[in-house]
């Protein structure tokens, strides 16, 4: 369910009207067709209007978004279904993967001549499982093979705090990266231990403040609502701790256990809808 996508579709249907009238009709449609409360319908429309203004800056004719994946993590979280492997088990393959990746980046750069990316996103996995020198080569290859003059956002998913070092952050700062993400998922140590995230709450805070010290002024943090063993009070405490850190943006996901995740393979059932609803 993506409520802002529904709102965007409705707003586009009423494009010939004033913004106020389009919003009024969209809120009515949410209420009458989807039985959504007035408050939530208004919120969906407000976000959709903001998104519409941001999306209007994209070059749909000649622009594109570039995604680069690093499929390694310090450890694989129990709930994760992404294609990622523990870095320790694949250490001898990382250099080969990077060699092939850089070759592909150069090839895509040639294929996309005449076009400029609107956004660049380095995700995974955990990109900062790469060594600083490897990260340097990756970012250098991207900047040398694409015209980044039109980029609205360049993100490096720093991700797990136990993979973040001052040396790696200093490398990222050398390049036109505009946003990084440091992702605790929760600030409850008992949960981190339970789901296989082998880092501490203190490491999250240390990584965040280190990034601030080095000059990063657009730091996102990811949280997951509904992690095993957590209730609304745990989420409230996590949000309180995150608020004290003042990240520039916050992304909250609802837990979804998929077949590829270890929890999914173990047949664990998810019955947390009411708890997640309270958290959100």
Where are the predicted features?
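N-terminal [4Fe-4S]-dependent radical SAM core
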Residues: 13, 20-66
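Canonical Radical SAM [4Fe-4S] cluster-binding loop centered on the CxxxCxxC motif
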Residues: 61-96
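Conserved non-cysteine loop/helix-boundary elements of the Radical SAM core domain that shape
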Residues: 84-278
